[in-house]
Structure formats: C-alpha cells, structure tokens
Amino acid sequence: RHYGIKPEPLPPGTRRGDCTTFDSSHTLSLSDYGSSPADKQSSEGAFPEAPAETEASGDKPAIDPNNPAANWLHARSTRKKRCPYTKHQTLELEKEFLFNMYLTRDRRYEVARLLNLTERQVKIWFQNRRMKMKKINKDRPKE
C-alpha cells in the first residue's frame, strides 16, 4: 500500500506508459478526470499474470528459483519510456515560468489540462526549470 499518494489521472483514451501530446482537436472537461469508487475497487489488485508456459517456451531462459540473480538479470524493465514535450507544450510552460516561477495547485491543474499533461509532469517540469535557472545564475560571472 502507498500512503499519502494519489493516483495520477490520465487523459481519456491513453494507457499508462503512453506519451501524451498536445491535441487541439480534443479539449478536456472536469468530468473526463472523474471515476467512480466502484471502478477503483474493481481495478485494485487486478494484475494480469502471464501464463508460465509462455515464459518457459521460446528463446527466453527458464526461471530458476535457486538463482535469484539470474532472474533479476532477465527481468523486464517497468520504467516508462521517455516522452519529450512538444514545441507547443515547452513554449507554453516557458511562458508560464516567465510569468511565475511557482504554480499554485489550481494553476498547475489548469496548465496540465490545457497542455494535455498530468499535474505531476507539470510539477516536475517546473522543479527542473527552477534548478536550471539556479545553475545558470550560479555559473554566470559576478560583476
């Protein structure tokens, strides 16, 4: 269980791990982000398990319970692939940053909705941008 961590809502039609890019043909409404408690209960603990026979067959090495290091070496990565921001998203984030280096929660939600990003992506972009500005200011020679 993860305490104090809210699941990040995804825009409709996207799966976890997909890149979200700006799509001007689809504007999101608040109802797009909602889900009923029944949906949450049915999805909890429902991880599809791959059949053991598909892993044993083919060119993949068999899982050896006596050798956990070998299993770790052949484990699949669960990391999401890197999704670069579109030029439009970057431009809008930079404009927002020039206006205000820190976002309120409401403004972060609004920016995320407008750019078809998650609130977490916007938050982390602003954190990274502040660190970049700090580094630029530190490296600049003092006169």
From Swiss-Prot:
Protein name: Homeobox protein Hox-A9
Keywords: Developmental protein, DNA-binding, Homeobox, Nucleus, Transcription, Transcription regulation
GO-annotated cellular components: nucleus
Transport found in the keyword field: no
GO biological process: anterior/posterior pattern specification; embryonic skeletal system morphogenesis; proximal/distal pattern formation
Domain of life where this protein originates: Eukaryota
Biased composition (Polar residues): 21-44
Keyword Transcription regulation belongs to the record: yes
GO MF, one example: RNA polymerase II cis-regulatory region sequence-specific DNA binding
Function comment: Sequence-specific transcription factor which is part of a developmental regulatory system that provides cells with specific positional identities on the anterior-posterior axis.
Record InterPro entries: Abd-B_homeobox_TF, HD, HD_metazoa, Homeobox_CS, Homeodomain-like_sf
Protein family per UniProt: Belongs to the Abd-B homeobox family.
DNA-binding residues (ranges): 78-137
Region (Disordered): 1-75
Subcellular location: Nucleus
